Amino acid sequence: MNRTLTRDQVLALAEHIENAELDVHDIPKVTNDYPDMTFADAYDVQWEIRRRKEARGNKVVGLKMGLTSWAKMAQMGVETPIYGFLVDYFSVPDGGVVDTSKLIHPKIEAEISFVTKAPLHGPGCHIGQVLAATDFVIPTVEVIDSRYENFKFDLISVVADNASSTRFITGGQMANVADLDLRTLGVVMEKNGEVVELGAGAAVLGHPASSVAMLANLLAERGEHIPAGSFIMTGGITAAVPVAPGDNITVRYQGLCSVSARFI
């Protein structure tokens, strides 16, 4: 993989971006200072942020996919989605409270998450292998929060920023993947009692399981895989909706439960 950053530059950028998250302040996108950064560089920075969190005692509890719309990929001129990691303090219970004082400019997306019962290895992982390896799926609302000024960034910068990961809210109802048609599963997002977004599972690469397969193949490029028991958020079914203190959100999943949270 093509790289342009030295190890010291990777370490410095990881500290810079993570400090923006922890200290709750925005920063210019990193490609302003490093215009020749590559995807390999960006993932090196992301994995170093992960290492920093684990060294601090945080536990990695899942993975997430981003840029999982074919239209969005075409718009950005890329052929694959991106991924990030989730740590323990990102998790919020259904009906719980999200403290916006710890976030910069949060937005929410409706997603379907997979939990695996068998490992998945790339390259060449496909949707059939994912479905066979799935223990259950669970409705999830992701809170994204770019550390970059005005939520404006390029693809390299957002990969380095752990794909804008910050919080996630899981519903209480698990479902067998064989009992659902995830392509046509409908989603209604409400904010303060008003419908703000509608979507269906096919918005995620035609089928959310395709997102998991792509994750396995992306991880294989770094010699990694998806272990059994992994929690994976597959990407936004809806567009991202800004939230602010005082907002109450509910996302209703067809044939499943709803997921709610309050922002303070």
UniProtKB/Swiss-Prot annotation:
Q: Which GO terms describe its biological process?
A: benzoate catabolic process via hydroxylation
Q: Which reaction does this chain catalyze? A: (3E)-2-oxohex-3-enedioate + H(+) = 2-oxopent-4-enoate + CO2
EC code: 4.1.1.77
The record's Gene Ontology cellular component field reads:
cytoplasm
Where on the tree of life does the source sit, at the highest rank? Bacteria
Pathway, according to UniProt?
A: Aromatic compound metabolism; benzoate degradation via hydroxylation
Please indicate if the UniProt record lists Lyase as a keyword: yes
Keywords for this protein: Aromatic hydrocarbons catabolism, Lyase, Plasmid
Point out the signal peptide segment: none
Transmembrane is among the record's keywords: no
What does the record give under GO molecular function?
2-oxopent-4-enoate hydratase activity; 4-oxalocrotonate decarboxylase activity
NCBIfam families hit by this protein: catechol_dmpH
Family, per entry: Belongs to the hydratase/decarboxylase family.
The name of this protein is: 4-oxalocrotonate decarboxylase
